[in-house]
Amino acid sequence: MASLLARRSFSALRARHLAFSGQGLQGSHLCGLQSRAISYGSNKDDEEAEQLAKEISKDWSTVFERSMNTLFLTEMVRGLSLTLKYFFDPKVTINYPFEKGPLSPRFRGEHALRRYPTGEERCIACKLCEAVCPAQAITIEAEEREDGSRRTTRYDIDMTKCIYCGFCQEACPVDAIVEGPNFEFATETHEELLYDKEKLLENGDRWETEIAENLRSESLYR
């Protein structure tokens, strides 16, 4: 009986000792965590303070720079210097429409039907231009004359369909249909861009000098 009581008392003392030692370890662990948290918080506060100081210095430098620009009108002076630079540079533009730049002899502009120097129409109504036109903008009707030659009774071009490819001019065996040098033929209505034979012949008579010169200069390459 005495041995049993001794064992129980020893077990109780051992358990109490373990309990006290566990509380001590737990307390030391908590103290370590608290110290780490305090050190982490202090480091974070230091970083935020340093970042705030940098932003404040940057803001002050920006304010100072803007104040100096406003005081000395640096932006205005910079803009005026650019204006003066281009003011004294040589002109690279022309005063259109009072001045017009050069056109290439191969320029493809408004269509025209040409005549021979005798006044006879060049077109022989072969309809090659009508056949080769990719936009199907040309409509031709013809009949045979008393002398056996064929001439057109109708020659229409829908300028709203034309893509100015120049195939009609290349296909013509007698240089009757050409694309002249005129590029100023804007209209207000659609009907004005539906050219008939009379309109095309009128264009040819008007631009014959320029057209003949362009064809002559390009004759070696055709």
UniProtKB/Swiss-Prot annotation:
Its EC number is 7.1.1.2. GO terms for cellular component: membrane; mitochondrion; nucleus. Keywords: 4Fe-4S, Electron transport, Iron, Iron-sulfur, Metal-binding, Mitochondrion, NAD, Oxidoreductase, Repeat, Respiratory chain, Transit peptide, Translocase, Transport, Ubiquinone. It catalyses: a ubiquinone + NADH + 5 H(+)(in) = a ubiquinol + NAD(+) + 4 H(+)(out). Residues 114-143, 153-182 form the 4Fe-4S ferredoxin-type domain. It comes from the Eukaryota. This is NADH dehydrogenase [ubiquinone] iron-sulfur protein 8-B, mitochondrial. It comes from Arabidopsis thaliana.
